[in-house]
């Protein structure tokens, strides 16, 4: 087939009368033409409308039926309109139903289930049953919502719906979070288990090294035996090949046979050489070398011109047998097979040329003999068949090209179809996911399925609320009620005990009394009782005797001790008060007394308050947690049935997973919620007195009245402080030597896994760690922050800071605009992060030089720090001033003298050199000699470890470290105070001079003072740097008239752009805001005199211009964004500002001017006519309302245009649905008619 033949690019077939070929794009060659059916099918797979190669858009023309009328009948339009309206009504009704179910019905159900759980817990308890009156419940936390309407029931419904929505959101968030945390925990738990198994495996390997060595020796012996067997097999193969070569000598030349024998001999060398080498040769290397060096039979004679193909099938079959024998040696050593067979066109060309060569370079000729016939040349038939061979070769080449092209086309079609199938499957998955979401929401699918989903969700959430809140609350309520009952009713318990004792006493002593009373009536015993004067006692009943005894004890015992009892009570009360007053000076005692008061208030006022319910629910969770831990610690099963044991095992696994999730949630909540709140409260306490109205009483009142807002503010302050502290620690890590902060975990450590650590470590260890961190943060905040603030407050110079929001200093938000610009310039010019890092690096290195800690802290060892000069009292100043290399440049005499006066002291430390070293108790800082021998203990040499290094440590090492921290803190505190005091004092003076009648505002004062100092300092620094680098002289040498003119033109361009961007455009945008928005609203609500503030409009215009700029330049593919990029690409040499002005700024400015001027001009021209129509409207009112009227008319015009477009599309859709027959593809460059009929197409 010729290259010019027209075939389809997809199906590779020619055109037909019923299926012609088209060239719809710019592509040429074999992919120029395509069938319309193939193209439509491909476009359906790819979801594209243009060619992927030339990006040309495919053009189709719609083909309509012959019976299509010119205009659609009105009845059809009405039916379609009714059908469309019906579908829209059904759809919007369904939307309203789903909206009602999701936002009203389900939240109300959840709210009632929530209230029902608490009502059951409050009803079926002892304390609640004893209540005779229950106060009516308030609407909840949504009191403002519950007062919207005048109907109480409707207000209650609205409040319950709002609370239910919040409850729904919280429950959904908790469920999703619990699911994600569970997956996260299980994933990390699996990794932990795998690592533990790996560690156990390593331990087993370490304990069984002898067995591993024996196994290695056995493998080595097997390798040697395999090597010997391989050599025997290859020797046998060589003998058989020599026999075959004798047969080949009859048909080939001796040189070719000798060449083949030499190649085959290389294999024997490769087999013999490894036997002579060491025993650690890999078996894989032997087999690979065997495959790479197998001989190739090349029986070709350059002088011969005729060749007859001869196939050696017998040779191949025998060699395959021996190859199988060689392969049988391999499986136990896992040797990779590398032999392959190539069938490429290059191999075919080698066959035609008369040579049998390797196609891929790594295959054996023995396995390739049956695929590639060996060509043996014949000199006798040299010139007879030369022309025939050339024809055969040419025909063979054509056939190979056709076959190769067909194979390539098949491969390309398969790849194209695979890509299309993959894209179709991915798109179908996305569509299914989207359809599933819509069906779940109720917008698609059967309505019964949606209602079923709602019922299932309501049931699941109700069960969750009952399980997670109701049952713990009821259980905790019962426990708390019983405890409070015992506390409230101690006399009841005593009465119960006394009644039990009384019954027992009556039963025993009364029975004995009656028996003795009977015995007294006997003749013999009556005389004995008369002599003992006991007959009168037994003459009465037991009840009378016991009552007389009780009255006698009370009269003779308690009456005499009343005075002593009253004295004891009086002294106990007075002593208690004195003890409380004496111990109240201690803060710990006051905290305990505060908690005692809170506990007393809780005990006395326990009811159904929110705080009580939270506490009760926590008590219930604690009880269930205790029961669950007790059950998991039980080593035996509760049941003996195997099936029940399986259920019990599953229940245990669920409890373990819940325990892991609860443990992670508790630790995570403490570290990210409770701990920041704790830090925020401490910082708030430290800031008491810094502001004018910030006192302890006010802070406590605010936290009491607004608890949620106060907790959030404390959390925000605390988390910000912790983040800044973490950034500071990260900066210190970059300054000091690696390994100094080994005791602080590095978050960037790849071996640090906080989640796995939470799962591995016990709960008590985690709580101890958090408590230790809390103590450190408490000490740091109180000691380093609170102490400084307290000292500054005692001076009365800076504090209290005056800050107010009413009245505003500026009517226009110029302060916000200035703050944004100044902060941006400050960050760009001053680079605060680099400046802070440089300050701390200088500070730490300077104090390390003073304290001789440079080797340990900074990793820089200096000889002058390893001792001292006895007669020099201020040697630290000498170390600061002098350079470390000064001692090396001294003369020999000076060095000897310095060495003679220098006294070495201190020692060396074996310390970590990385921050990720595992901490070992008592083995991190080991005193050693310079050579690495321990000073104390066994005095052995420490083991070499890349994670440790030797540094110098002076005498009093730990005291010097404490002094380093103390000096750094003092210097940083002084610098911070100066950065606050100096700008604030200067700013207050400038602010009072500029705004004498305005309320004091220290925020503005500090900003004015800071930038009044910093910008001049930066200008001086930049000027010195500019002069030092000699920029002026180099610039003056390059100046000429052309450069000056170019610079002036560029300056004029920038001035024009700045004038437009800073003055013209902001003023126009501010005027549009004022004329179209502000003035109409003021006119409607206030008909007084209105005045335009140009400054305020300019500020508002600047904000609007910035928003417009960021909106149009957010997408880099837009035309405006590309113009801005091109304009400022070469901003200092050749800025392209004119295209930007021509295409963007001038049209935009003209549109703004027209929007400002045209309504006023129209009002001026049409005022006589308008005044006759609206005689009551004044001229001023018309001018004020004309701009919004123009805006409304423009909006109506846009809506009308949109309505016309929608109507046209709708009628076109009806036409397509009723009369469309098909489409016809157009060739590239043809003008496509709008539509054709079916007869015209034919």
From Swiss-Prot:
Zn(2+) 1 binds at residues 8, 11, 35, 38. Zn(2+) 2 binds at residues 25, 27, 51, 54. Residues 111-165, 475-495, 600-612, 685-710, 793-806, 983-1002, 1076-1089, 1165-1179 are lumenal. PROSITE patterns: ZF_RING_CH. It catalyses: S-ubiquitinyl-[E2 ubiquitin-conjugating enzyme]-L-cysteine + [acceptor protein]-L-lysine = [E2 ubiquitin-conjugating enzyme]-L-cysteine + N(6)-ubiquitinyl-[acceptor protein]-L-lysine. Residues 1-89, 187-453, 517-578, 634-663, 732-771, 828-961, 1024-1054, 1111-1143, 1201-1242 are cytoplasmic. SMART domains: RINGv. A zinc finger (RING-CH-type) spans 1-61. GO terms for biological process: ERAD pathway; inner nuclear membrane-associated protein degradation pathway; protein ubiquitination. The modification Phosphoserine is found at residue 253. Pathway: Protein modification; protein ubiquitination. One of its GO terms (cellular component) is endoplasmic reticulum. InterPro entries: MARCHF6-like_C, Znf_RING-CH, Znf_RING/FYVE/PHD. The RING-CH-type zinc finger domain is required for E3 ligase activity. E3 ubiquitin-protein ligase which accepts ubiquitin specifically from endoplasmic reticulum-associated E2 ligases, and transfers it to substrates promoting their degradation. Mediates the degradation of a broad range of substrates, including endoplasmic reticulum membrane proteins (ERQC), soluble nuclear proteins and soluble cytoplasmic proteins (CytoQC). Component of the doa10 ubiquitin ligase complex, which is part of the ERAD-C pathway responsible for the rapid degradation of membrane proteins with misfolded cytoplasmic domains. Belongs to the DOA10/MARCH6 family. This is ERAD-associated E3 ubiquitin-protein ligase doa10. It comes from Schizosaccharomyces pombe (strain 972 / ATCC 24843) (Fission yeast). The lineage of its organism: Eukaryota, Fungi, Dikarya, Ascomycota, Taphrinomycotina. The gene is doa10.
């Amino acid at each position: 087939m010729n290259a010019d033949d027209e075939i389809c690019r997809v199906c590779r077939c020619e055109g037909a009368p019923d299926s012609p070929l088209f060239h719809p794009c710019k592509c040429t060659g074999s992919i120029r033409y395509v069938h319309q059916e193939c193209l439509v099918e491909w476009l359906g797979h790819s979801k594209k409308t243009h060619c992927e190669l030339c990006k040309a858009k495919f053009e189709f023309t719609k083909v309509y039926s012959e019976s299509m009328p010119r205009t659609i009948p009105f009845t059809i339009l009405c039916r379609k309109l009714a059908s469309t309206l019906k579908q829209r009504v059904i759809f919007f009704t369904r939307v309203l139903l789903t909206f009602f179910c999701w936002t009203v019905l389900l939240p109300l159900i959840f709210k009632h289930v929530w209230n029902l759980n608490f009502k059951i817990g409050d009803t079926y308890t002892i304390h609640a049953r004893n209540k005779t009156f229950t106060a009516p419940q308030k609407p909840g936390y949504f009191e403002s919502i519950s007062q919207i309407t005048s109907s109480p029931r409707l207000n209650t419904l609205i409040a319950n719906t709002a609370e239910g929505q919040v409850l729904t959101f919280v429950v959904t968030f908790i469920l999703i979070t619990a699911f994600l945390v569970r997956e996260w925990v299980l994933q990390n738990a699996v990794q932990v288990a795998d690592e533990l198994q790996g560690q156990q495996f390593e331990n087993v390997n370490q304990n069984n090294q002898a067995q591993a060595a024996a196994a290695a020796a056995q493998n080595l012996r097997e390798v040697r035996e395999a090597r010997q067997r391989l050599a025997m097999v290859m020797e046998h193969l060589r003998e058989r090949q020599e026999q075959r070569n004798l047969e080949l000598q009859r048909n080939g030349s001796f040189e070719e046979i000798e060449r083949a024998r030499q190649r085959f001999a290389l294999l024997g060398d490769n087999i013999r050489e490894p036997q002579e080498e060491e025993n650690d040769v890999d078996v894989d290397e032997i087999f690979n070398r065997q495959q790479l060096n197998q001989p190739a039979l090349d029986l070709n004679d350059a002088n011969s011109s005729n060749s007859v193909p001869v196939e050696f099938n017998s040779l191949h079959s025998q060699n395959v047998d021996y190859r199988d024998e060689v392969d049988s040696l391999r499986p136990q050593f896992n040797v990779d097979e590398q032999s392959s067979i190539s069938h490429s066109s290059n191999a075919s060309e080698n066959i035609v040329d008369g040579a049998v060569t390797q196609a891929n370079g790594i295959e054996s000729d023995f396995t390739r003999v049956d695929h590639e016939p060996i060509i043996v040349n014949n000199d006798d038939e040299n010139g007879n068949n030369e022309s025939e061979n050339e024809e055969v070769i040419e025909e063979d080449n054509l056939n190979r090209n056709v076959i190769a092209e067909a194979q390539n086309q098949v491969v390309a079609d398969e790849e194209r179809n695979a890509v299309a199938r993959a894209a179709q499957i991915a798109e179908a998955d996305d569509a299914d996911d989207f359809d599933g979401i819509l069906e779940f929401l109720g917008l698609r699918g059967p309505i019964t399925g949606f209602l079923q989903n709602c019922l299932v969700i309501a049931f699941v959430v109700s069960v969750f609320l009952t399980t997670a809140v109701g049952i713990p609350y009821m259980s905790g309520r019962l426990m708390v009620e019983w405890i409070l009952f015992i506390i409230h009713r101690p006399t009841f318990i005593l009465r119960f005990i006394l009644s039990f004792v009384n019954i027992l006493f009556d039963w025993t002593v009364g029975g004995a009394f009656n028996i003795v009373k009977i015995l007294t009536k006997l003749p013999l015993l009556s005389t004995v009782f008369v002599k003992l004067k006991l007959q009168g006692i037994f003459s009465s009943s037991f009840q009378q005797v016991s009552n007389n005894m009780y009255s006698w004890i009370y009269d003779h015992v308690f009456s005499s001790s009343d005075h002593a009892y009253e004295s004891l009570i009086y002294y106990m009360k007075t002593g208690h008060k004195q003890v409380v007053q004496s111990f109240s000076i201690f803060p710990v005692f006051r905290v305990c007394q505060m908690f005692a008061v809170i506990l007393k208030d809780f005990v006395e006022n326990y009811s159904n308050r929110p705080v009580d319910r939270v506490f009760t629910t926590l008590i219930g969770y604690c009880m269930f947690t205790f029961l669950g831990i007790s059950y998991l610690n039980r080593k035996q099963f509760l049941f003996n049935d195997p099936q029940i044991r399986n259920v019990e095992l599953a229940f245990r696994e669920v409890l373990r997973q819940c325990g892991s999730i609860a443990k992670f949630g508790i630790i995570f909540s403490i570290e990210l919620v409770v701990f920041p709140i704790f830090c925020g409260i401490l910082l708030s306490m430290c800031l008491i007195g810094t502001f004018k109205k910030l006192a302890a009483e006010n802070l406590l009142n605010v936290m009491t009245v607004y608890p949620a807002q106060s907790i959030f503010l404390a959390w925000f302050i605390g988390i910000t402080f912790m983040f800044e502290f973490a950034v500071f620690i990260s900066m210190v890590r970059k300054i000091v030597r690696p390994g100094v902060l080994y005791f602080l975990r590095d978050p960037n450590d790849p071996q640090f896994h906080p989640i796995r650590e939470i799962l591995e470590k016990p709960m008590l260890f985690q709580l101890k760690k958090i408590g230790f961190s809390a103590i450190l943060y408490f000490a740091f905040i109180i000691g380093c922050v609170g102490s400084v603030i307290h000292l500054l407050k005692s001076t009365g110079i800076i504090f209290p800071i005056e800050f107010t929001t009413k009245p505003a200093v500026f009517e226009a938000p110029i302060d916000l605009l200035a703050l944004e610009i100044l902060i941006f310039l400050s960050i760009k010019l001053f680079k605060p992060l680099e400046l802070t890092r440089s300050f701390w690096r200088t500070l730490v290195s300077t104090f390390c030089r003073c304290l001789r800690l440079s080797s340990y802290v900074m990793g820089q060892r200096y000889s002058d720090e390893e001792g001292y000069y006895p007669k020099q009292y201020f040697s630290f100043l000498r170390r600061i001033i002098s350079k470390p290399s000064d001692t090396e440049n001294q003369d020999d005499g000076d060095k000897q003298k310095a060495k003679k006066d220098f006294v070495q002291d201190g020692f060396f430390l074996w310390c970590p050199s990385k921050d990720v070293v595992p901490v070992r108790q008592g083995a991190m800082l080991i005193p050693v000699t310079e050579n690495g021998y321990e000073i104390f203990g066994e005095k052995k040499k420490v083991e070499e470890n890349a994670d440790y290094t030797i540094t110098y440590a002076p005498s009093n090492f730990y005291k010097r470290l404490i002094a380093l921290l103390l000096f750094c803190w003092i210097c940083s505190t002084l610098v911070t105070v100066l950065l606050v005091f100096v700008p604030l004092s200067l700013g207050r003076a400038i602010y009072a001079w500029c705004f004498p009648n305005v309320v004091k505002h220290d925020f503005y004062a500090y900003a004015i003072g800071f930038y009044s100092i910093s910008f001049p300092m930066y200008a001086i620094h930049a000027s010195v740097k500019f002069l030092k680098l000699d920029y002026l002289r180099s610039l003056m040498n390059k100046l000429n008239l052309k450069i000056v003119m170019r610079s002036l033109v560029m300056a004029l361009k920038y001035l024009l752009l700045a004038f437009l961007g800073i003055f013209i455009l902001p003023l126009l945008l501010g005027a549009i805001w004022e004329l179209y928005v502000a003035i109409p609203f003021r006119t409607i609500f206030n008909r007084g005199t209105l005045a335009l503030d140009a400054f305020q409009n300019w500020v508002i215009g600047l904000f609007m211009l910035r928003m417009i700029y960021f909106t149009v330049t957010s997408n880099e593919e837009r035309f405006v964004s590309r113009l801005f990029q091109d304009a400022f690409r070469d901003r200092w040499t050749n800025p392209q500002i004119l295209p930007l002005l021509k295409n963007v700024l001038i049209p935009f400015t003209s549109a703004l001017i027209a929007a400002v001027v045209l309504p006023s001009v129209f009002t001026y021209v049409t005022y006589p006519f308008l005044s006759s129509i609206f005689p009551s409207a004044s001229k001023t009112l018309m001018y004020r309302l004309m701009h919004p009227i123009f805006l409304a008319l423009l909006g109506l015009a846009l809506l009308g245009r949109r309505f016309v477009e929608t109507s046209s599309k709708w009628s076109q859709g009806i036409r397509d649905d009723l009369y469309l027959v098909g489409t016809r593809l157009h060739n590239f460059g043809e003008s496509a008619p709008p539509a054709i009929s079916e007869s015209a197409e034919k």
